[in-house]
A protein has these predicted regions:
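Sec-dependent N-terminal signal peptides
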Residues: 33-41
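C-terminal motif of bacterial Sec signal peptides marking the signal peptidase cleavage site
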Residues: 44-45
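Accessory terminal helices/loops
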Residues: 50-64, 173-177, 186-194, 199, ...
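Active-site metal-binding motif and surrounding structural segment of the metallo-beta-lactamase
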Residues: 69, 74, 98-100, 110-157
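Conserved beta-strand hairpin/beta-sheet module of binuclear metal-dependent hydrolase folds
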Residues: 71-124, 246-259
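Metallo-beta-lactamase
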Residues: 76, 100-101, 108-110, 164-235, 281-293, ...
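Feature captures hydrophobic
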Residues: 412-427, 431-443, 448-608
Length: 608
């Protein structure tokens, strides 16, 4: 005997759903249709976040209101102290001394830094005696070449800045470049860009030129200096980066705070990717500001702030917001919360939400909570199902199977698009495309969901990420930062950094049967290295091993420029000399190293 059952149930948005369960046999019940019923309930009422309808212009007010913060202008904070805002995503700051100048932060590229220097020269023609980096982010250091053309100023920074720059610019450059291009909207039309949350724009493109002058003087905890009669105290203040510093001008009671505070909820985590940013260190560093009680606060993004009590109140709210996220995240973590549930638990108090300096136009509380979990406990959520989780393709196949096939899930996804549940559409379209990349009918649904989410989003980073991914999917490309390093910039990077980056591109499948040692003699730097290629691993040894199978003599700059494609490999290789082995053997060695091609986020790697 069997049974036909028709069920009516009410979902969200007051829609009534009707499902007819087919013939149920005692020996072989149609489990899939029952699971489909449960699946629809789960996706409709429990596990998805309902998307808002697309915003009209008035709903962009939170992001657009901040445009005035980034107006291109040089502010006179006090006599002899100037902050240049709006020349790029970050500020550059000028201090005028008795017989020279101090520059704090140098913008993100040479064209912008040359322009700000020209305008600084309208204020003073004195020589630049010192440059101070507040931290290692590109928008604060890669314009430095403009400030050292005719002089050799001292360059001050925290002792950890240089190794951080070298690591960031070698190990994860490709993926952080891609995610940065999405986050900052480098591929978007100007009409799609309001601002980037902490500045007017970040405009890296193929014509962008960078240069970085390494520090000449570093310190660990604090350092008192005097430059051209200006007494300054440099203070280590880890926050947005571990190498962050403050610069205190005691005579004028001015504090330059880098990126530890700006007019937005802080980027306690950045979606372009970063190492863990300690929330505790961050709010403790904000307490340094409160203890110093400056009359003027000069951030490296946005306008200067004046008024001792006003600054104290702003910073108190700011540090309280960071500590609140830190403490309440730990409270939930210790209670056993899953990261997804922790995000729902930790919500800023209303009085902090009202602060004009805590609007979520750059950082977000939810991202910060997830980072707090990962930074304190690592990747494992505590759910045993995630010890050996289904891979993304298998999980997508399971979801499609539960839905009764891709046609059913596609139909359901379309229904969600009609009622403007864009986050649901984004999630389900990902399952469908991972299940079968040939389901081209899904792509327009996903693109529309991404675009609607982007239009309605007031967080600049999320907005640009949504819109750029829609563009990538529409035009089938992967966003990348197109900037190539200049020969001058490459010259400043040690050979060991370049080699470390090079060996990370080893294709193990081409080297599992290999055991060879290749020696490098860099004639210009008088350095020697050996790369021991051993069954899928390339070990860099900082010396020339006697039993090397192949030994090549070369110029380090040729090697760097060849690897970054500033020079043609075909012509550059002809300049190398071989003390042992030959060009053919060396070419075969090089072929074993190649970076994996980047894929669109929603795709599943083939692992070929």
């Amino acid at each position: 005997m069997g049974l036909n059952v028709k069920v009516l149930f009410f979902g969200s948005q007051n829609y009534v759903y009707s499902l007819t369960f087919g013939w149920f046999d005692k020996n072989c019940m149609k489990i899939k249709t029952l699971v489909l019923f449960l699946f629809l309930i789960l996706f409709n009422d429990c596990n998805t976040t309902k998307s808002k309808t697309p915003a009209n212009d008035s709903e962009h007010i939170h992001l657009e209101e901040f445009n005035a913060e980034f107006e291109k202008k040089i502010y006179e904070v006090a006599p002899g102290v100037y902050s240049a805002v709006g020349y790029g995503i970050a500020n550059s700051i000028l201090l005028v001394g008795k017989d020279g100048l101090v520059i704090i932060d140098t913008l993100d590229e040479l064209k912008a830094s040359k322009q700000v220097l020209e305008d600084f020269r309208k204020i003073s023609s004195l020589p630049i005696k010192a440059i101070i980096y507040t931290h290692s982010h590109p928008d604060h250091i890669f314009g430095s070449g403009s400030f050292v053309t005719d002089v050799s100023p001292e360059v001050y920074a925290h002792e950890s800045l240089l190794p951080t720059v070298q690591k960031l610019a070698s190990e994860t450059t490709p993926i952080i470049g891609t995610r940065s291009a999405r986050m900052f909207g480098n591929y978007l039309e100007k009409s799609d860009l309001v601002n980037v949350g902490i500045g007017p724009y970040q405009g890296y493109n193929a014509d962008t030129k960078l240069d970085f002058v390494p520090p000449t003087k570093t310190f660990r905890d604090s350092l008192n200096i005097e430059v051209s009669g200006i007494r300054l105290r440099l203070i280590h203040a880890p926050g947005e980066t571990d190498d962050q510093i403050y610069i205190y001008h005691p005579e004028k009671n001015i504090l330059f705070v880098g990126d530890n505070i700006y007019k937005a909820f802080p980027n306690l985590y950045t979606i372009r990717g970063t190492w863990f940013r300690s929330l505790k260190h961050w709010y403790e560093s904000l307490d340094i500001i409160r203890n110093l009680k400056p009359e003027h606060l000069v951030p490296s993004h946005g306008k200067p702030i004046s008024g001792k009590s006003y600054i104290y109140d702003i910073v108190t709210d700011y540090r309280d917001a960071v500590q609140f996220v830190h403490d309440q995240s730990l409270r939930g973590i210790n209670a056993g919360y899953h990261p997804d549930d922790l995000v729902q638990l930790v919500q800023l108090p209303e009085h902090l939400k009202k602060s004009p300096y805590l609007k979520e136009i750059y950082g977000k509380v939810s991202w910060s909570v997830r980072s707090a979990f990962a930074g304190n406990l690592g990747w494992f959520s505590g759910d045993a199902a995630e010890l050996h989780p289904l891979d993304r393709k298998v999980y997508a196949d399971l979801i499609v199977d539960l839905a009764g096939g891709s046609e059913n899930l596609l139909k359901y996804t379309k229904s969600k698009l009609q009622i403007k549940e864009y986050q649901t559409v984004l999630t389900l379209s990902g399952y469908l495309l991972r299940h079968d990349p040939k389901l081209t009918d899904v792509i327009p649904l996903r693109i529309e969901a991404l675009e609607k989410l982007g239009v309605s989003e007031s967080n600049a980073n999320a907005k640009h990420y949504y819109l750029t991914e829609a563009l990538e999917l529409r035009n089938q490309f992967v966003a990348k930062i197109k900037v190539r390093p200049s020969p001058e910039l490459l010259r400043r990077y040690p050979v060991k950094v370049i080699l470390s980056s090079f060996v990370a591109n080893l294709d193990p499948k081409l080297s599992f049967d290999t055991d060879e040692k290749v020696g490098f003699i860099f004639l210009d730097t008088k350095e020697t290295y050996t790369i021991h290629l051993r069954k899928g691993v390339a070990e860099v040894i900082p010396s020339l091993i006697a039993d090397a199978d192949l030994i090549v003599e070369l110029n380090s700059q040729d090697w760097k420029e060849m690897l970054t494609r500033l020079k043609s490999p075909a012509t550059t290789l002809l300049k190398f000399r071989f003390k042992k082995g030959n060009l053919l053997s060396f070419t075969q060695f090089l072929k074993k190293f190649s970076p994996k091609e980047q894929i669109l986020t929603l795709k599943v790697p083939t692992n070929q």
